[in-house]
């Protein structure tokens, strides 16, 4: 019984979240100004940020829709603009 409870708790927390979505937002050191979206694991939303153009990571999406699809976010939970 305890095993099943633990299994469902872990499954509920991790459902729909791609590992890349847990990476931190990385603006990068370059000075370009590309509007992008990243998954904020604290707010559990896709949020807008300005990407510098280099040395980012996989938590960097061209559109809100792409971020929500990859990271399993429901549309009503987004967007939050920064």
From Swiss-Prot:
Pfam family, one: Kunitz_BPTI
Keywords attached to this entry: Disulfide bond, Ion channel impairing toxin, Nematocyst, Potassium channel impairing toxin, Protease inhibitor, Secreted, Serine protease inhibitor, Signal, Toxin, Voltage-gated potassium channel impairing toxin
Range of residues in the leader sequence: 1-16
Predominant subcellular localization, coarse grouping: secreted
Entry keyword annotation includes Secreted: yes
Function: Serine protease inhibitor that inhibits both tissue and plasma kallikreins. Has hemolytic activity. Inhibits voltage-gated potassium channels (Kv).
Protein name listed in UniProt: U-actitoxin-Avd3j
Organism for this UniProt entry: Anemonia viridis
Lineage: Eukaryota, Metazoa, Cnidaria, Anthozoa, Hexacorallia
């Amino acid at each position: 019984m305890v095993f099943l409870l633990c299994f469902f708790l872990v499954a509920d927390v991790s459902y729909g979240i791609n590992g890349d979505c847990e990476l931190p937002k990385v603006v990068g050191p370059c000075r370009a100004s590309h509007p992008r979206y990243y998954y904020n694991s604290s707010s559990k939303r896709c949020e807008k940020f300005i990407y510098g153009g280099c040395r980012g990571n996989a938590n960097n999406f061209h559109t809100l829709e792409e971020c929500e699809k990859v990271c399993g976010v429901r549309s009503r939970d987004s967007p939050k603009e920064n």
